[in-house]
């Protein structure tokens, strides 16, 4: 499969700390990136690492380490044709540090339709789980939604915004999907990607806070951008047409 190519443009610097859990890498094979779970899978999963690296080089000014971690984790995960667990990314930092920007970029360069893809699922506690008294219903609905969409397409992305506002019981529903196992609730979930966004504090594995992991990444010299962007032209970014 030939990866789709998009152009990039500078959007400014961003991001606090990135915590990553990924599967080990195997031999690089673009054909393995296609969604192949079930005979009726219609995933629009079309990773464009050149575009992602180009945009991250523009966006993460002074955050070379963060950029490298994101790309390294994604490549390692996607190179493995049979990962033992999903990829879990936790983005956290102060308001305005660009956590949502990074998640939008990932969706944009992994799926043909970006955040509009039917296989990218964006949850906000304020919008989707506003009433604490409805927790049990939310737990049932969330489990059913994740399970059902992974059955349709194992290459799905689940984005959870404002994790600091999410009821703890909902995290418990997600916990079985985040670990190492072959099947959960009869569903193959090991090729999924989960992104958790939290204000300031780090989100530990399975929703537990990780002490001593807050604060901005140390600034490092920005890598030359010309090499990444030399072959690219025109507007791009999440929401761009193309």
From Swiss-Prot:
This is Prosalusin. One of its GO terms (molecular function) is ATP binding. Residues 1-26 form the signal peptide. It comes from Bos taurus (Bovine). Pfam families: Torsin. Keywords: ATP-binding, Cleavage on pair of basic residues, Glycoprotein, Hormone, Nucleotide-binding, Secreted, Signal. Residues 27-189 form a propeptide. Its main location: secreted. Belongs to the ClpA/ClpB family. Torsin subfamily. Gene3D superfamilies: P-loop containing nucleotide triphosphate hydrolases. The keyword ATP-binding applies. Salusin may be a endocrine and/or paracrine factor able to increase intracellular calcium concentrations and induce cell mitogenesis. Salusin may also be a potent hypotensive peptide. InterPro entries: P-loop_NTPase (IPR027417), Torsin (IPR010448). GO terms for cellular component: endoplasmic reticulum lumen; extracellular region; nuclear envelope. ATP binds at residues 93-100.
């Amino acid at each position: 499969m030939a990866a789709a190519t998009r152009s990039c443009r500078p959007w400014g610097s961003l991001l606090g700390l990135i915590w990553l859990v990924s599967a080990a890498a195997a031999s690089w094979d673009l054909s393995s990136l296609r969604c192949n779970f079930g005979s009726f899978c219609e995933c629009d999963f079309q990773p464009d690492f050149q575009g992602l690296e180009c945009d991250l080089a523009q966006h993460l000014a002074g955050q070379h380490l963060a950029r490298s971690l994101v790309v390294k984790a994604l490549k390692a995960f996607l190179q493995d044709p049979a990962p033992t667990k999903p990829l879990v990314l936790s983005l956290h930092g102060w308001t305005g540090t660009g956590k949502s920007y990074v998640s939008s970029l990932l969706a944009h360069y992994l799926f043909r339709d970006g955040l509009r893809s039917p296989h990218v699922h964006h949850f906000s506690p304020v919008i989707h789980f506003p009433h604490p008294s409805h927790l049990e219903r939310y737990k049932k609905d969330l489990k059913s939604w994740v399970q059902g969409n992974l059955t349709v397409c194992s290459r799905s992305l689940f984005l959870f915004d404002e994790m600091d506002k999410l009821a703890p019981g909902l995290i418990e529903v997600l916990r079985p999907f985040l670990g190492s196992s072959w099947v959960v609730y009869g569903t193959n979930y090991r090729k999924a990607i989960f992104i958790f966004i939290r204000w300031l504090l780090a989100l530990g594995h399975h929703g537990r806070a990780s002490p001593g992991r807050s604060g901005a990444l140390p600034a490092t010299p920005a890598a030359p951008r010309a090499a990444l962007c030399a072959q690219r032209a025109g507007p791009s970014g999440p929401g761009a047409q193309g």
